[in-house]
Amino acid sequence: VLLTGVVPYGDMRLEAVRLAWQQNGVNEVLNEISIDTGYGLDDIAKDKFISTQLFTKIFTDTNIKKFKYDFEVQKQIVYLFGVSSDQKEVELVIEHAKEIKGVLDIINYIQSR
């Protein structure tokens, strides 16, 4: 389970992790929730812009199998996840994320099989 988002208090972050672990079948919880009281509409708009750009790049690239990957954008950080047996394809997804203006970091949780 990948947890992302922004909360104003640390106890809310811990509660999210606790709730994730309580679900049946959970083997791992990746906590990327950040604490920030200043996350506003401007930040949401930037994240949405990045998300839309990345979706378009992945969806229109004929070298990428679209349904193997998913992503989340929080505070201009792109979190990639999915499962792939094709390392070149993974590198292409990462490269598309790097090309987008405003991306501060890319966290790759794509598992190789």
Regions found by a protein language model. Name each.
Residues 1-113:
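N-terminal targeting leaders
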